[in-house]
């Protein structure tokens, strides 16, 4: 009887050890599976527009990334250039600013928004290739019936009119009788005058 008891005790002990071993293995596997994988944060890059240059085209919408209707601050961001403002000029309902290190281009601001872009630098051109120095005939040849010619203040204005008659945007080529001396992109009525602020009623 003593021998039987001893065998029983040995057998029981072996069973307990076998039952506990898988439990430890499962716990270890579970521990491995619940370990989160390392995470990689996405990299973000900020792309700034290139500075405004003569490679940017003048259109009925603006000049390069500078759009009609922008504030001066928005134009600085879009052009990649600071704007030079005379002291106290922002208190006026109409004033003119220039982009730093970009002579020959100015922006007329009416009631806080850019309404006219005045280009006198012959390096700039429209998206169709029109530029300062061209004759009136060359401008007419480029745009055909879209050009409306008007005598204005001792010169002539060759105005490009969009096909949509309700569109107030224009590009105006001012000629001294021989060749184009200025190109303006803007909205009527401001763009139709050599002095946009006078057209806006400032100083009257």
Tell me the role of every PLM-derived stretch.
Residues 71-110, 136-181, 185-188, 203-204:
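A cross-family detector of function-defining hotspots
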Residues 11, 93-95, 196-198:
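Sequence contexts marking disulfide-bonded cysteines in secreted/extracellular proteins
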Residues 69, 127, 131-135:
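Glycine-centered tight-turn and secondary-structure capping sites
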Residues 6-9:
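C-terminal motif of bacterial Sec signal peptides marking the signal peptidase cleavage site
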Residues 1-2:
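Sec-dependent N-terminal signal peptides
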Residues 51-61, 114-123:
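Acidic/histidine-rich, surface-exposed loop or edge segments in extracytoplasmic proteins
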Residues 59-61, 89-96, 122-126:
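N-terminal post-signal-peptidase region of extra-cytosolic proteins
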Residues 21-49:
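Extracellular mucin-like PTS domains
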């Amino acid at each position: 009887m003593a021998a039987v008891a001893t065998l029983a005790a040995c057998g029981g002990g072996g069973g307990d050890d076998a039952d506990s071993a898988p439990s430890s293995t499962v716990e270890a596997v579970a521990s491995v599976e619940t370990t989160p994988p390392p995470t990689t944060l996405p990299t973000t890059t900020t792309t700034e527009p290139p500075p405004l240059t003569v490679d940017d085209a003048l259109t009925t919408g603006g000049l390069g990334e500078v759009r009609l209707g922008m504030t001066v601050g928005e134009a600085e961001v879009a052009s990649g250039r600071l704007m030079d403002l005379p002291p106290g000029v922002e208190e006026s309902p109409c004033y003119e600013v220039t982009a730093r290190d970009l002579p020959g281009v100015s922006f007329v601001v009416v009631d806080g928004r850019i309404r006219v872009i005045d280009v006198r630098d012959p390096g700039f051109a429209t998206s169709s290739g029109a530029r300062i120095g061209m004759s009136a005939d060359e401008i007419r040849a480029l745009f055909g019936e879209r050009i409306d010619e008007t005598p204005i203040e001792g010169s002539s204005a060759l105005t490009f009119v969009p096909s949509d008659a309700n569109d107030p945007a224009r590009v105006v080529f001012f000629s001294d009788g021989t060749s184009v001396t200025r190109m303006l992109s803007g909205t009527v009525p401001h763009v139709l005058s050599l002095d946009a602020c006078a057209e806006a009623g400032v100083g009257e």
